[in-house]
Curated annotation (Swiss-Prot):
Homodimer. The tRNA molecule binds across the dimer. ATP binds at R264, R265, E266, E351, I352, S353, S354. It comes from Prochlorococcus marinus (strain NATL1A). One of its GO terms (molecular function) is serine-tRNA ligase activity. Catalyzes the attachment of serine to tRNA(Ser). Is also able to aminoacylate tRNA(Sec) with serine, to form the misacylated tRNA L-seryl-tRNA(Sec), which will be further converted into selenocysteinyl-tRNA(Sec). This is Serine--tRNA ligase. Keywords: Aminoacyl-tRNA synthetase, ATP-binding, Cytoplasm, Ligase, Nucleotide-binding, Protein biosynthesis. GO terms for biological process: selenocysteine biosynthetic process; seryl-tRNA aminoacylation. Pathway: Aminoacyl-tRNA biosynthesis; selenocysteinyl-tRNA(Sec) biosynthesis; L-seryl-tRNA(Sec) from L-serine and tRNA(Sec): step 1/1. Disulfide bonds: none annotated. L-serine binds at T233, A234, E235, E287, S386.
Length: 426
C-alpha cells in the first residue's frame, strides 16, 4: 500500500512512479480525502480537548463543594455530552472517508524503486546474464510431446475430473514431481531457510495484505460459503504469517521456504499454452520469502535471486536473468528479476522464477513492523521468489534431457531423490 503521508506531502512523486508503470492516475480525489481526514482530525482533537477541559472543571467544582446535582454541574455535563456526540459523528465521518480512501489506495500498485529500469512492457526488459549452454535442433520435442510418448500424464481424464488446464501425473512423472519438491526444499534449507507448510486456503485479509486483492480477484478461486480462497502462491500465507506483528530486529532477516499447491484461474490467458505444464489452474511451487530490514532489502534481493539460480545450476538447466522494466513490474513489486529457463523443444526461454523486492508495500497493507536503531516502530521490507515452479522445472528437464532413443537423462542432483539417472520408454 502506498504511504498516505507521501500522498499528502509529495503527490508528484507518486504520479511519476505510476506514470513509469504506464498509469495516468488522477490523485485529486485521494488528496481531497486526505485533506478532509486531516481537517476532521484537527476538529476532533479540538473538541476532545474541550471535553477534557470540561471534565476537569466538573471535578474541580465538586472538590470545591459544589453539589453533584447543582445546575452548574448539570449544565457542564450536558455540554460535555454534546461534545461527545459531536466527536462520535466526526469519528463516523472519518471512518467513512478512511474506508473510501483505503479502497482506492489498495488498487494502486507499488512504486518502482529510484533509478529503476524505465520501459513500457516486456520488450524493454534488460538481460543481465546467462548461465549454461542452450542446446538446439530441429528434431527436439516439446515437453508435452515427450510426456505423451512416455505416458507420464493424462490431461483428457483430468478435464473429466475437473476441467481443462489440469493434469494428472502418473508413475515416473509423479515421482519426479515429488523428487523435485524435496530436492528444492533440502537445497534451500541448507542455505539457512526455515521450512514452513502453510494452509492452501487463505482469507480475504491475507490476499489483500499481499496485494492479490482487490486487483486479481478474477484470477483467484473463491469458496462459495466461506471467506476463503485457494492460494495463488505461498507468498500470500507467508506474508500473513506475521500480519499485525512487530518482529524483533535481531531476528531479521527471517528466511522462509515453503512448498505449496497453487491455484489460478488464468482468466486472461485464454488460448495461450494450452498444452503441457506451462500454464495450469493447479501447480506446485517452492517459494522463497524474506522479511528484512529496510536498509538490507536491496542486498536481500540479490541473494534470494542467487538462491533461486542455484536450483537451476544444480539441475544443469541453462537460463538467463532478466531485470523487469517499470512497465512490466508486478503489482506489489518495486524491483524484480525474472529467471527464464531454456526450453530447447520450444526453442525459447520461459519464465521459471520471479524474484521481487516489495519494499514496505506488503508490510504496510499487513501491518508488519520491526524496530529501528532508536527502538521506534517502523515497517520492515518483504521479498519473495519462486525457488522454483515445479511443473516448469519438469518441462525444462524433459526438454533439455531428451535423447535420440526416447529416454530422458536426469540431472545428477536428482539421482538421490529419484533413484535413477534416466526416464526410459516402456
Amino acid at each position: 500500500m502506498i504511504d498516505q503521508r507521501l500522498l499528502r506531502e509529495n503527490p508528484n512523486l507518486i504520479s511519476e512512479g505510476l506514470k513509469s508503470r504506464g498509469m495516468d492516475v488522477d490523485l485529486g480525489p485521494l488528496q481531497k480525502f486526505c485533506k478532509d481526514l486531516k481537517d476532521l482530525e484537527e476538529k476532533r482533537n479540538s473538541l476532545q480537548a474541550q471535553g477534557n477541559s470540561i471534565g476537569k472543571e466538573v471535578g474541580q467544582k465538586i472538590k470545591q463543594g459544589l453539589p453533584h446535582d447543582s445546575e452548574e454541574i448539570s449544565n457542564l455535563r450536558v455540554k460535555g455530552n454534546q461534545i461527545k456526540k459531536q466527536v462520535g459523528i466526526i469519528e463516523e465521518e472519518e471512518k467513512s472517508i478512511s474506508n473510501k480512501l483505503n479502497e482506492q489506495i489498495l488498487c494502486l500498485p507499488n512504486l518502482p524503486e529510484k533509478n529503476s529500469l524505465e520501459g513500457k512492457n516486456e520488450k524493454d526488459n534488460k538481460e543481465l546474464r546467462r548461465w549454461g549452454e542452450p542446446i538446439s535442433g530441429n528434431t527436439l520435442k516439446e515437453h508435452w510431446e515427450i510426456a505423451n510418448q512416455l505416458n507420464l500424464w493424462d490431461s483428457e481424464r483430468s478435464s473429466v475430473i475437473a476441467k481443462s488446464r489440469f493434469v494428472t501425473l502418473f508413475k515416473h512423472a509423479a515421482k519426479l514431481e515429488r523428487s523435485l519438491i524435496n530436492f528444492m526444499l533440502d537445497l534451500h534449507i541448507k542455505k539457512g531457510y526455515l521450512e514452513v507448510l502453510p494452509p492452501a486456503l487463505v482469507n480475504t485479509a491475507s490476499l489483500t495484505g499481499s496485494g492479490q486483492l482487490p486487483k486479481f480477484a478474477e484470477e483467484s478461486f473463491r469458496c462459495a460459503d466461506d471467506d476463503l480462497w485457494l492460494t495463488p502462491t505461498a507468498e500470500v500465507p507467508i506474508t500473513s504469517l506475521h500480519r499485525g506483528e512487530i518482529i524483533p530486529r535481531d531476528l531479521l532477516p527471517l528466511k522462509y521456504v515453503a512448498y505449496s499447491p497453487c491455484f489460478r484461474r488464468e482468466a486472461g490467458s485464454y488460448g495461450r499454452d494450452t498444452r503441457g505444464l506451462i500454464r495450469l489452474h493447479q501447480f506446485n511451487k517452492v517459494e522463497l520469502y524474506w522479511f528484512s530490514t529496510p536498509e538490507t532489502s536491496e542486498d536481500a534481493l540479490e541473494q534470494i535471486t542467487s538462491d533461486a539460480e542455484s536450483v537451476l545450476q544444480e539441475l544443469e538447466l541453462p537460463y538467463r536473468v532478466i531485470q523487469l522494466c517499470t512497465g512490466d513490474l508486478g503489482f506489489s513489486a518495486k524491483k524484480t528479476y525474472d529467471l527464464e529457463v531454456w526450453l530447447p523443444g520450444a526453442n525459447t526461454f520461459r519464465e521459471i522464477s520471479s524474484c521481487s523486492n516489495c519494499g514496505d508495500f506488503q508490510a504496510r497493507r499487513s501491518s508488519i513492523r520491526t524496530k529501528d536503531n532508536n527502538k521506534k516502530n517502523i515497517l520492515l521490507h518483504t521479498l519473495n521468489g519462486s525457488g522454483l515452479a515445479i511443473g516448469r522445472t519438469m518441462a525444462a528437464i524433459l526438454e533439455n534431457g531428451q535423447q535420440s532413443d526416447g529416454s530422458i537423462n536426469l540431472p545428477k542432483a536428482l539421482i538421490p531423490y529419484f533413484g535413477s539417472n534416466k526416464l526410459q520408454p516402456e
